[in-house]
Amino acid sequence: MTEKYKIGIIGLGYVGFPLACLFAKKYKVIGYDIKESRINEINQGIDSTNEVTPEALKAALSNGMKCTSRLDDLKSCNVYIVAIPTPVDDFHNPELVPLKKASIAVGNVISKGDYVIYE
């Protein structure tokens, strides 16, 4: 496992969760989501989105992937990937409130020299 980077994935939905499982093959990963129920199901080995096979989820958890709804748990990361949905309204304008909230959250835990990637 590569020790140089510890990756925090913010948003464990259709994009962030498969990404977290994939990165967990090589890196230390902490997945973060505001939905406690989502965190509980993932930590129990269940993926209600069906984006990841049960075997891939089990492998990610076995490799040390941690999932949490506690923002402070991300402080040990040095790479942050924000994978938050940006739905559009009836006029095709993106709803940016969730993205702004996620950005503020990341801003509360990053350190100088860390990387932030928006997916």
List PLM regions with ranges.
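Structural/interface elements that position substrates and couple domains in central-metabolism enzymes
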Residues: 1-119
